[in-house]
Amino acid sequence: MSAVSTYAEALFGAAREKDELERVLDDLREFCRALRESEELALFFYGEQIPEREKRRAIEALTEGMSPLTTNFLKVLCDNRREEILEDVLRRYEEMVEDHLGRIEVEVVTATELSGEMQERIRERIARVLGGREVILRTSVDPEILGGAVFRFKDRLVDSSIRGRLEGLREAMLERGVV
């Protein structure tokens, strides 16, 4: 088992026991977002030259108001010098929480903004295909796909965009020597 899975499973077990699965998930998302948004904070947190004692104090301050589980988990990562796997642990922990709660997060990329009604229709259709699981839709816009949509969930990618179809057609033509 990888270190990422080991840490994620340990955190999941502790959070489930305390009925704090979603709180810890929100905390970790917030902490990771702060690291991505502040280069200074990221250099401090990931920096190997920073003494463990200072990192622990900083974690205490940065996680004030968060679950003690989150605070302790981050300290353990630092104590074991495994800070670099935090984002991967977050992704694995997210998957575990979503699976446990019967939810699935689906990213939908379209060429134009989706209306609320269209988002709901897509959510319902995906839920039917995935056996009635609760679908959490994350939408984004990429005009370069021209039309259609690209769906990402778990380790899967479903490209039904016009750009994807055109690229597929181009590849098929190249294989047959048409172009």
UniProtKB/Swiss-Prot annotation:
A cellular component term, taken from the record's GO annotations: proton-transporting ATP synthase complex
What Gene Ontology molecular function terms does this protein carry?
proton-transporting ATP synthase activity, rotational mechanism
What membrane topology is annotated for this entry? Peripheral membrane protein
Question: What quaternary structure, including any partners, is listed in this protein's UniProt entry?
Answer: F-type ATPases have 2 components, F(1) - the catalytic core - and F(0) - the membrane proton channel. F(1) has five subunits: alpha(3), beta(3), gamma(1), delta(1), epsilon(1). F(0) has three main subunits: a(1), b(2) and c(10-14). The alpha and beta chains form an alternating ring which encloses part of the gamma chain. F(1) is attached to F(0) by a central stalk formed by the gamma and epsilon chains, while a peripheral stalk is formed by the delta and b chains.
Function, as annotated: F(1)F(0) ATP synthase produces ATP from ADP in the presence of a proton or sodium gradient. F-type ATPases consist of two structural domains, F(1) containing the extramembraneous catalytic core and F(0) containing the membrane proton channel, linked together by a central stalk and a peripheral stalk. During catalysis, ATP synthesis in the catalytic domain of F(1) is coupled via a rotary mechanism of the central stalk subunits to proton translocation.
Q: Subcellular location, in the record's words? A: Cell membrane
**Major location category of this protein:** membrane
Q: What organism does the record attribute this protein to?
A: Rubrobacter xylanophilus (strain DSM 9941 / JCM 11954 / NBRC 16129 / PRD-1)
Concerning its family, UniProt says: Belongs to the ATPase delta chain family.
Q: A single Pfam family, by name?
A: OSCP
* Name by which UniProt lists this protein: ATP synthase subunit delta
Against Gene3D superfamilies, the record matches this protein to: N-terminal domain of the delta subunit of the F1F0-ATP synthase (1.10.520.20)
The protein's UniProt keywords, in alphabetical order, are: ATP synthesis, Cell membrane, CF(1), Hydrogen ion transport, Ion transport, Membrane, Transport
